[in-house]
Design a protein with these regions (language model features):
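Secreted/periplasmic proteins
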Residues: 2-123
């Protein structure tokens, strides 16, 4: 029983409550990947239909509607995306980009990139 109680704070951090909206306040660094055409038309966690050609992304915790600048740390290329989907916390990715955003970053071939996320101006 005690072990279960000790695990609860960890679960609260791993899975933000509905209504809890952690914002991008500072720089975040991690791995970006992208999800492609097979998801076209499927509903995202925000309820919108996935459009591979829109500049959108999935995040484990950022609020829907957040605008973030994603910059490839190797090349310096960047793109601004809107968060409209969720990534499971066990996914070990910082962000999952649409095809259009991945193309703009130049990561379609390798599929992943080491990136920095910062709030986009006007976000």
């Amino acid at each position: 029983m005690l072990l279960g109680a000790l695990a609860l704070p960890h679960l609260a951090l791993a899975h933000p409550r509905a209504g809890h909206r952690p914002a991008v306040r500072t720089e975040r660094v991690g791995i970006a990947s992208y999800y492609g055409w097979r998801h076209q038309g499927l509903r995202t966690a925000s309820g919108a239909r996935f459009n591979p050609m829109a500049f959108t992304a999935a995040s484990p915790s950022l609020p829907f509607g957040s605008r973030v600048r994603v910059t490839d740390r190797r090349t310096g290329r960047s793109v601004v995306v809107v968060i409209n989907d969720r990534l499971p916390s066990f996914h070990h990715r910082l962000i999952d980009l649409s095809v259009a955003a991945a193309r703009e970053l130049g990561i379609l071939r390798q599929g992943i990139a080491w990136v920095t996320l910062v709030p986009a101006r006007g976000a």
